[in-house]
Amino acid sequence: MKKKYRIPKASVIIANYNNAKYLRNCINSILNQSYKNIEIIAVDDKSEDSSLEVLKKYKKKIKVIKNRKKTSKGSYNQINSYYKGFIKSKGKYIFFLDSDDYFKKKKIELVIKEFENNENLDLIFDLPILKFRDKEIKKKFKQKKFVISSWPRFSPQSCISIKKKLAKEIFKILKLKKFETIWLDFRIAVYYFLKNKQIYIFKKYLTYYRQLNNSASKDYKILNKNWWYRRKQAHEFVSFLNKKLKLKDKMNFDKIMTNIVNLL
């Protein structure tokens, strides 16, 4: 007699800070998924707007975690929120979602199908639909050659889906308060690439990714002082991982130029 197939549980972890304006849209995009075996965990990082009031309205449908103390290390606020949600999760597959972004209706169904059909897959990046004001933009994805820099091209945080076992391994190594300008998507992509020499891009546009005027990325306009400092931290992070993974730390033009500029 064949063993009955159990539909695996998906855990969607929403990281929120002062995004009451978009939070309903974010949560509703998960509640309305075509895939039904989903738990939703929303982690609020001491929001000062009406986010908690929004979350209260969903208390019967989602699990809410409130950070009692806001951390002060840039990207670590968000990483800490995702980690707190992760340790409470029960799903086989973990989906990260920033509270100003949202999923297409069939995203979870399609991503889990991709995982289940490819047992060697541990990590999937789908493609973002960029939302800027009233515009929606789908950029073509092209993987770059690693001649100039030390990391792969990848999609943003809300496009990450990961098996729980790998997420546990990654958080154990990457949940550290160093490299405050380096966000979770970069940490995961670089760690996985260095360890496995590739990352898997699922070439379907399944995540709406908002480009907001108050986005942290605006502080890092290309070639400004902050941009160069973050690039320096990115190279330092790669070196940190190479040491952890016992890999050779290579020098390249980008790394040399970045170090020179940061000395000026």
Model-identified regions with their sequence ranges:
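Cell-envelope/extracellular polymer assembly enzymes that use nucleotide-activated donors
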Residues: 8-11, 29, 39, 187
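Short, well-formed alpha-helical segments that are part of the catalytic scaffolds
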Residues: 19-32
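A conserved acidic beta->alpha catalytic loop
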Residues: 44-53, 69, 98
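Short aromatic/hydrophobic "clamp" motif used to bind/position activated sugar donors
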Residues: 94
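Conserved donor NDP-sugar-binding/catalytic core segment of glycosyltransferases
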Residues: 106-137
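Conserved nucleotide-sugar donor-binding catalytic segment
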Residues: 126, 145-222
